[in-house]
C-alpha cells in the first residue's frame, strides 16, 4: 500500500531543551524509592527542622532580651508614678474663650470699682472707720464735730430750752390757779361765817 502508515512500533523521538527537562522531571517523580532512600530523606528533613527550630528559638530569645532591655531602659528613664490620694487635685479645665460682651462687662466692673474708690477718697465720711485700741485713744484731745453733728446738737439744745420754758409757764399757771382756789375757799369761809352770824342775831331777836 503506497502512501499508507507504516504498521508496527513507532520509533522514539529525541527531546531537547524544555521538553527534555519536563520529561526528566516526570521520570524523577514517577520513580519508586527504596527504603534506604526514604530513611535518608527523613533524616535530612529532621535535621532541617531541628536547625530551623534552633534558629527560631535563638531569634525568640534575642527578641525577648531586646524587649526586656527596652522595658528596663524606659522604666529607668521615665518612672511611672501612681497617686493613690483620692483628694489629689485634677488638672484645671481649660477656660472658654471670653466674648466681647464679657470683656465689656469686666471693663465696666473695673471702672465702677475705680469710681467707688475715688468717691471714698473725696468724701471722708464714706471712709471706713478704723478701730483703735483704748490705749491709743486720747481722751483730752478735742473732738472736731462735723456739720451734721453740730446741727443735731443745736437742735437738741433748742428743744431742751423750749421744754424748760414750757415747764416754767406750766408752773406759773399752776401757781395762779392755786392762788385763785385759795382765795375762793377764803371767800366761801367768810360768807359762811357771815351767814352764821346773821342767823344767830335773828334767833336772839326772835327770843327777845
From Swiss-Prot:
Composition bias, Acidic residues: 105-121
Keywords: Coiled coil
Pfam families cross-referenced by the UniProt entry: PP28
Comp. bias regions, Low complexity: 52-69, 84-100
InterPro entries: Casein_kinase_sb_PP28, HAP28
Coiled coil (UniProt feature): 137-206
Source domain of life: Eukaryota
Region described as Disordered: spans on this chain: 1-133, 145-208
Cellular component annotations (GO), alphabetically ordered: cytosol
Biased composition (Basic and acidic residues): 16-44, 145-154, 162-208
Signal peptide: none
Record-stated family: Belongs to the PDAP1 family.
Protein's name according to its UniProt entry: 28 kDa heat- and acid-stable phosphoprotein homolog
Species whose genome carries this gene: Dictyostelium discoideum (Social amoeba)
